[in-house]
Amino acid sequence: MKAADVRSKSVDQLSDELVKLKKEQFNLRFQAATGQLEKTGRVTEVRRDIARVKTILREKSQAGK
């Protein structure tokens, strides 16, 4: 997910995306623990996407003040 894609979304969409990414991260952690994880790079990718979404949410909340 690119930062430009994230910036174009509304706050509600970003919140939904954050919930979805956190669920995916949870599932990936369990897959890794049980040895079922095939794409290990996806863990890093999801973690960075979560950081991107949180950063943009914070920027948007700061801009509103």
Curated annotation (Swiss-Prot):
The keyword Ribonucleoprotein applies. InterPro entries: Ribosomal_protein_uL29, Ribosomal_uL29, Ribosomal_uL29_sf. GO terms for cellular component: cytosolic large ribosomal subunit. GO terms for biological process: translation. It comes from the Bacteria. Keywords: Ribonucleoprotein, Ribosomal protein. GO terms for molecular function: structural constituent of ribosome. Belongs to the universal ribosomal protein uL29 family. HAMAP family: Ribosomal_uL29 (MF_00374). PANTHER family: 60S RIBOSOMAL PROTEIN L35/50S RIBOSOMAL PROTEIN L29, LARGE RIBOSOMAL SUBUNIT PROTEIN UL29C. This is Large ribosomal subunit protein uL29. It comes from Hyphomonas neptunium (strain ATCC 15444).
